[in-house]
């Protein structure tokens, strides 16, 4: 048996806390103004009508309403856009 730990065991053993990213309000849901719709890193989903974008790319509702997702084609890339329609 080895009398010393392998070097791998001292280099491993760390993990970062989860950032809880993702969709917080899905299509068809009612939301209030200021509600967070999506937490994301980068703009994988673009803001549409009545949706604001925070400095960390978080998308939030500007008005009370219903969440809509749509797919848009932009320069050979399919992108998603989220908007809030007045209800």
UniProtKB/Swiss-Prot annotation:
SUPFAM superfamilies of this UniProt entry? Ribosomal L27 protein-like
| Domain of life from the UniProt record | Bacteria
The molecular function terms of the Gene Ontology recorded here are: structural constituent of ribosome
Q: Which InterPro entries match?
A: Ribosomal_bL27, Ribosomal_bL27_CS
- Alphabetically ordered keywords of this record: Ribonucleoprotein, Ribosomal protein
Instruction: Write out the GO biological process terms.
Output: translation
State the coiled-coil residue ranges: none
Q: Does the keyword Coiled coil apply?
A: no
What are the boundaries of the region Disordered?
Answer: 1-26
One Gene Ontology CC term in the entry: cytosolic large ribosomal subunit
Asked if the Swiss-Prot or TrEMBL record annotates the protein with the keyword Nucleus, the reply is no
HAMAP family in the cross-refs: Ribosomal_bL27
Q: Which family does it belong to?
A: Belongs to the bacterial ribosomal protein bL27 family.
Which PANTHER family does the protein's record reference?
LARGE RIBOSOMAL SUBUNIT PROTEIN BL27M, RIBOSOMAL PROTEIN L27
Q: What is this protein called?
A: Large ribosomal subunit protein bL27
């Amino acid at each position: 048996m080895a009398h010393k730990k392998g070097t791998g065991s001292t280099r491993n053993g760390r993990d970062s806390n989860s950032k809880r990213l993702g969709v917080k309000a899905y299509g068809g849901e009612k939301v209030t103004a200021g509600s967070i719709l999506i937490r994301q890193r980068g703009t994988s989903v673009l803001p549409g009508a009545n949706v604001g974008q925070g400095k960390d790319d978080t998308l939030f509702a500007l008005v009370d309403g219903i969440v809509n997702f749509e797919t848009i084609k932009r320069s050979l890339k399919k992108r998603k856009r989220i908007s809030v329609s007045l209800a």
